[in-house]
Amino acid sequence: MKQIWKQTWRQRLAAALIQLLMVLAMAGVGIRMPVQAAEKNAVTQSGEMKVHFLDVGQGLSILAQSEGKTMIYDGGDRKTSRFVVSYLKEHGVSKIDYLISSHYDADHMAGLIGCLNAFDVKNVISSNYVHTSKLYQSFVKAVKADGLKMQHPAVGKTYKFGSGSFEILAPKTIEAKGSNNNSVAIKLMNGENSFVFTGDAEHESEAAMCNSSIDLSCDVLVPGHHGSATATSWDFLQKTVPEYAVISCGTNNKYGHPDKDTMDKLQSMDIQVYRTDKQGTIVVTSDGANLNWSAEPCNDYTPGDDSDQGTQSTSEVQQEASQTATGEHVWVSATGNKYHKTNHCGNMNPNTAKEETREEAEAQGLEPCKKCY
């Protein structure tokens, strides 16, 4: 009997131990899962990043701040150099981790010389060409005086910046004449939010960016060359598909910036517009998922020159000529599976669109664009 009782007791003890181990194993999984979830959240969540679009009149200057790191992209003209330096100091800047000169035109570069003299600068990124101006020589001298070298990174190079990063988009090549298409363009990223700055890059540089394998999509685009007609092509807008555009230009500037053609494109694509000539300095804060602006968009799509009537594209002329044709005519893009009422729908490039009858479009299996119909 004792032997049977011992055997039964051992069996019960073994069963109890097995049950205990199972409970502990399950408890261990329960403990580990929240830790793993926390680790995953730490990866997907981003810290705060502030982007300031400074009102430097007819010029460009953008300040970015994140987790103690600072970037200045262009510094505006001579007459606003003191303002830029003062603004940075007022916002707690003592050092600049990345000073980026998109190109060497005075309305972009002059204020950077003041920044080099006033702050501890860690890195200078600029375009790999030489300008003939005395201002350029002053810039080079200021860089050397700080014991720095001008870095000319290749397209695709990525830098860590605070809670995010930025990637070089342009220039792919350097033009011997002119400087606008030599502009250093970047995509600044923080979690799911992103910004594209292109300096004075024009259509040729934009085309090179579009033909690269880099994802150009962004939440915020600063239209190139202050909203000039020489930049912000349809193809570039369709690649960037921004929700917001921030135009940096001077009030009643002599160039007529922003151009009517550019503003018409932004309006046709329902892109929300901010303008420094109308609203002054604009600040946006990113938490990696959402954008919090210092002001509402002005959505003022009027050109800088009231007499600017824009240009009429060939496709628009064709549209007018076909108005007398029988049957409903629609517009079809070179790619895509929709047809459109107008070639300026905003969801297609009007310069590559072709016109045909609705019956022909539907026979190809195309469906009506939800924005047009």
Give the predicted meaning of each segment.
Residues 313-337:
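SH3-family beta-barrel domains
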Residues 2-9, 28-322, 346, 370-371:
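Non-globular, low-confidence helical/coil segments that flank catalytic cores
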Residues 356-368:
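A short, charged, amphipathic alpha-helix used as a generic interaction element across diverse proteins
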Residues 335-353:
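Beta-loop motif signature
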Residues 10-26:
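Sec-dependent N-terminal signal peptides
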Residues 270, 280, 352-358:
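Low-complexity, intrinsically disordered Gly/Pro/Thr-rich segments
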